[in-house]
């Protein structure tokens, strides 16, 4: 299984700990950065993780920023992503089993590394429970997404992504 992971500069150490944990469990980790503590912004990393999951390059994603709020909002803007910001096992399992979440988000300064690893492990192992009710809920979420599919400026991230491709991971 391939897991995409991304973070901002505030939680690089926490992301590396999670990445090492996932590798120790035998998962392939695709690390979308950031890789140091130079100031950067989470939307790029949420976008990268989300696009990897939607395209099939990764099976699931993990997004981490200081509180988790920003990067989780960013990744949820990628069409086809259902990400849950969690800090406990119950929420993570509900997200996967009932809403078929494909990305999990954390506040790396809110949730400790060991707890994040335990939650991620349970999230990965949990299975979506396909019921008529769950399918209807997911369809309603997808409808909201498709209803607003036309971005005002589809090239908004182009400059940032070009910098990324050149190895410039910060402002």
Curated annotation (Swiss-Prot):
Pathway info: Carbohydrate metabolism; D-galactose 6-phosphate degradation; D-tagatose 6-phosphate from D-galactose 6-phosphate: step 1/1
Keywords: Isomerase, Lactose metabolism
Keyword Transit peptide listed: no
Name of this chain's protein: Galactose-6-phosphate isomerase subunit LacB 1
Subunit structure comment from the entry: Heteromultimeric protein consisting of LacA and LacB.
Species assigned in the record: Streptococcus pyogenes serotype M3 (strain ATCC BAA-595 / MGAS315)
Entry superkingdom: Bacteria
Statement: the UniProt record of this protein carries the keyword Lipoprotein: no
EC number per UniProt: 5.3.1.26
Stored Gene3D superfamilies: Sugar-phosphate isomerase, RpiB/LacA/LacB
PANTHER family, per database record: DNA DAMAGE-REPAIR_TOLERATION PROTEIN DRT102 (PTHR30345:SF0), RIBOSE-5-PHOSPHATE ISOMERASE B (PTHR30345)
Record's catalysed reaction(s): aldehydo-D-galactose 6-phosphate = keto-D-tagatose 6-phosphate
GO molecular-function terms, A-Z: galactose-6-phosphate isomerase activity; ribose-5-phosphate isomerase activity
InterPro entries: LacB, RpiB_LacA_LacB, RpiB_LacA_LacB_sf
Family stated for the protein in its record: Belongs to the LacAB/RpiB family.
BP GO terms, sorted: D-allose catabolic process; galactose catabolic process; lactose catabolic process via tagatose-6-phosphate; pentose-phosphate shunt, non-oxidative branch
Gene expressing this chain: lacB1
């Amino acid at each position: 299984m391939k897991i995409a992971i991304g973070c901002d500069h505030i939680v690089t150490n926490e992301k590396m700990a999670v990445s090492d944990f996932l590798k120790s469990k035998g998962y392939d980790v695709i690390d979308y950065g950031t890789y140091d503590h130079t100031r950067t912004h989470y939307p790029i990393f949420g976008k990268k993780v989300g696009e990897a999951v939607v395209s099939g390059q990764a099976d699931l994603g993990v997004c981490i920023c200081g509180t988790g709020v920003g990067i989780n909002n960013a990744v949820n803007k990628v069409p086809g992503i259902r990400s849950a910001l969690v800090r406990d096992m119950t929420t993570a399992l509900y997200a996967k089993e009932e809403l078929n979440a494909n990305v999990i988000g954390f506040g790396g300064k809110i949730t400790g590394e060991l707890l994040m690893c335990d939650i991620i492990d349970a999230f990965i192992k949990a299975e979506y429970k396909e019921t008529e009710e769950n399918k209807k809920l997911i369809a309603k979420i997808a409808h909201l997404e498709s209803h607003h599919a036309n971005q005002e400026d589809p090239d908004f991230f182009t400059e940032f992504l070009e910098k990324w491709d050149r190895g410039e991971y910060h402002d």
